[in-house]
């Protein structure tokens, strides 16, 4: 029991010391590049009302939606080991078909074209 208490106290002290050093150390060296905000290549000191491409925004949102839907397929190798792999196969097939139909719809509506 005493070994457990010593281990917990030692781990707590070490983690506290490391956290204090991590908060204290970066404040010693401030460079101009580190102290200026940087946001995706845009000048942070310029106007906040810059024109923004709506087409770029729509393509980015479309990418995020498809990316999140594909992330639903990641647990499939583990889901196949369930007692009813046929249900998993049907659900994954439906999800892939939904992705294919969504991509076809975006393609037909010219949502992935940059020029009009």
Curated annotation (Swiss-Prot):
Enzyme class: translocase
GO biological process: mitochondrial electron transport, NADH to ubiquinone
Primary localisation category: mitochondrion
Highest taxon, organism lineage: Eukaryota
Keyword line: Electron transport, Membrane, Mitochondrion, Mitochondrion inner membrane, NAD, Respiratory chain, Translocase, Transmembrane, Transmembrane helix, Transport, Ubiquinone
Bilayer disposition of the protein: Multi-pass membrane protein
Function: Core subunit of the mitochondrial membrane respiratory chain NADH dehydrogenase (Complex I) which catalyzes electron transfer from NADH through the respiratory chain, using ubiquinone as an electron acceptor. Essential for the catalytic activity of complex I.
Subunit structure: Core subunit of respiratory chain NADH dehydrogenase (Complex I) which is composed of 45 different subunits. Interacts with TMEM186. Interacts with TMEM242.
Protein name according to UniProt: NADH-ubiquinone oxidoreductase chain 3
Source organism per UniProt: Didelphis virginiana (North American opossum)
